[in-house]
Amino acid sequence: MPEHHQYQFEFMGLLFNGTTMITTTIAMAIVVIITVIGCRKLAMRPTGLQNFIEWVVDFCRGIIKANMDWKVGGRFIVLAYALLFYVFVANMMGIPFELVTKEGHNVFWKSPTSDPVLTLTMAVFIVVLTHIYGIMVTGPSTYGKSWFTPKWFLFPFKVIEEGSNALTLGMRLFGNIYAKEILMLLLVSLGTTAVYWGIFAFVPLIVWQAFSIFIGSLQAYIFAMLAMVYMSHKVEQH
């Protein structure tokens, strides 16, 4: 299998992953464009893209209602929608093809969620956001007391729990998507080795691409669901 490297560049002494930045920007643009077009001409009887957008919003509403009261959780509908839709699009981006330069074997196209830096950054952002809303919704006093209930000596374990939540949330998404792309790259490399290997690799590649769609969809759901679970722990008094 040929060795491929992700495109990187240095700016002000810092090393940036250009591949992740490119694909992340494209994924965000896809989400924004589809949402804007779908909501541009709203109708009482939705059709086409508006129908799809409303279905995604209803699905996100179901995720929120499953974890917290709607009066509290209704404010997170946009967050849930953005997380679910973006992670889904990002997961799907590596399925059709991989764009590689011939000279340096630099990968310019992949699922951005196969980069642990991105997934862990998103996970940390979610965990930090839960604490911000925890203070805003329950108040500083109630939020502060929650760290020492039911017993004060559990405080260190709660700190560890917050760190593990961010770590597992990010690494779960990264691990599944990275494994998906590695196996797909192996099948493609096998298929291009020789004609007879291409015949044997074609069917498994098609099957794996279909299964990759399922994996990407499932991981997008899990990421959005866990984000709302963590949010409910902070904004609702248990």
Swiss-Prot record:
Compartment list: Cell membrane
Membrane topology: Multi-pass membrane protein
Keyword terms, alphabetized: ATP synthesis, Cell membrane, CF(0), Hydrogen ion transport, Ion transport, Membrane, Transmembrane, Transmembrane helix, Transport
SUPFAM superfamilies referenced in this protein's UniProt entry, alphabetically: F1F0 ATP synthase subunit A
CDD domains, A to Z: ATP-synt_Fo_a_6 (cd00310)
PROSITE patterns on file: ATPASE_A
UniProt cross-references to Gene3D superfamilies, sorted A to Z: ATP synthase, F0 complex, subunit A (1.20.120.220)
GO molecular function, one term: proton-transporting ATP synthase activity, rotational mechanism
Main location: membrane
One matching Pfam family: ATP-synt_A
Keyword Membrane: yes
Transmembrane spans: 18-38, 76-96, 117-137, 173-193, 208-230
GO biological process, one term: proton motive force-driven plasma membrane ATP synthesis
Subunit structure: F-type ATPases have 2 components, CF(1) - the catalytic core - and CF(0) - the membrane proton channel. CF(1) has five subunits: alpha(3), beta(3), gamma(1), delta(1), epsilon(1). CF(0) has three main subunits: a(1), b(2) and c(9-12). The alpha and beta chains form an alternating ring which encloses part of the gamma chain. CF(1) is attached to CF(0) by a central stalk formed by the gamma and epsilon chains, while a peripheral stalk is formed by the delta and b chains.
Family affiliation: Belongs to the ATPase A chain family.
UniProt cross-references to PANTHER family, sorted A to Z: ATP SYNTHASE SUBUNIT A, CHLOROPLASTIC
Name this polypeptide is given: ATP synthase subunit a
Protein source organism: Shouchella clausii (strain KSM-K16)
Phylogenetic classification of the source organism: Bacteria, Bacillati, Bacillota, Bacilli, Bacillales
